[in-house]
Amino acid sequence: YVFGNMNEDDLAVGVRDSVEEDENKRNKADFVLWFTKSKFDSQELKWESPWGVGYPGWHIECSCISYKHCGEYLDIHCGGIDNAFPHHTNEIAQSEAYLGHKWCNYWFHVHHLNTNSGKMSKSKGEFLTVSLLESKGYDPVIYRFFCLLSHYRKSLVFSYENLDNAKGAYEKLVAKIAQLLKAEQGEVDKAAYDKLREGFTAAMDNDINTSLAITALYDVLKADTTPATKLALIADFDKVLSLSLIEKAKAVNEKPADTNDELPAEILELAEQRKQARCLLYTSDAADEAR
């Protein structure tokens, strides 16, 4: 049991109401590679095999797909925290028994996305899709930015208010980069570049701490160095973050001038105060910078 330091003697059988103890098991830790006796009355997908007509177990499907498309070795295997046991544990057991060597170097388990009422669950009809966000007018990159502001080992609470706060922070970030693009560039300062890049690299090396990585991005914007240096770093960081920062900033600069100068100064001030008041979201290390 490679995850969670579990002890086989402590495992309980059939604890959930939806799970019955399988009388075909010789050992409580057994799991099925190939079903010849279906759990389901209406099982339709079946194939001939050396072991009889049947279908693959849940775990073997994933091992076979990985082996076919990625080969014998995986560097990083991702999944939700609820896949760590038993699914990924069983994947390791069967894959390494077949391959005869270590299969994956790193396992990356992301914690749950929650609502205020608890964990999002497809079975409860409570789940989020990118197409749903797009239908509500959100660019998918906003959701990505929202997720990156929190560490993957922490459960993340989703609400549209929180997403709007992330949207405001992202737009402010892009606006600052847009200003850099319009500034006199100067030369890339190699020493400053290397020093600032160290902060980002250290954050990602620290258990993929994207929250600290975003902080390192804001540090670049505040740094006393040339626009050329800052833009080179932002482009470099975005190879990892995939936030389309330069692309979005260029799009901002290509837009026609807005008509804000036609609005009364009092209205503009109130709008800015309201915008600032809404940015109360983040508890991560990137929070103060995002606000």
What do the predicted segments below correspond to?
Residues 1-179:
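Alpha-helical recognition segments enriched in aromatics with Gly/Pro capping
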Residues 32, 287-290:
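Intrinsically disordered, low-complexity regions of eukaryotic proteins
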